[in-house]
Amino acid sequence: MKVVIDTNVLINCISSRTKYHAIWQAFLTGEITLYASTDVLLEYEELVLQKYPVKIASDIIDILLDPDYVRQQDIYYYWNAISIDKDDNKFFDTAVASGAEYIVTNDNHFKSAKRLSFPKVNIISADDFLQILKSLFDE
């Protein structure tokens, strides 16, 4: 399953103490395939370095830069689908370019992009994505 994960969810799913940790585990085990553009990876790196101690952050960044875990996606067209926080457009553009099944985010700025009929991208909350993972992998 191809996904793009917004930074707010990624940062919160890494710790085993969060309810979203199953997302990180699904990523590490290859149950989901994470797609990220260079701009997305740079944002991940910036915020991981802010949130975690240097050694842990370095290990997380190494995983995020490993092509066995993350598929780097080039962006060929900028849709400008999110007007409230234009910085979030990189996630939308990555999802469109990669053909991702979902953008996983808890950010309300993505609501405007949900209403687009083209290009259609499934934008869901981390809670909804957990339910999808549960239904797919807890059979």
Give names to the regions the model predicted.
Residues 1-17:
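Metal-dependent nucleic-acid phosphoesterase active-site entry motif
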Residues 6-7, 36-37, 106-107, 125-126:
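A secondary-structure boundary/capping signal
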Residues 26, 64, 94, 115:
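Hydrophobic/aromatic ligand-binding patch that stacks against planar heteroaromatic rings
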Residues 33, 69-71, 122:
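Conserved beta-strand segments of alpha/beta enzyme cores
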Residues 69-103, 108, 112:
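Active-site neighborhoods of divalent-metal-dependent phosphate/nucleic-acid chemistry enzymes
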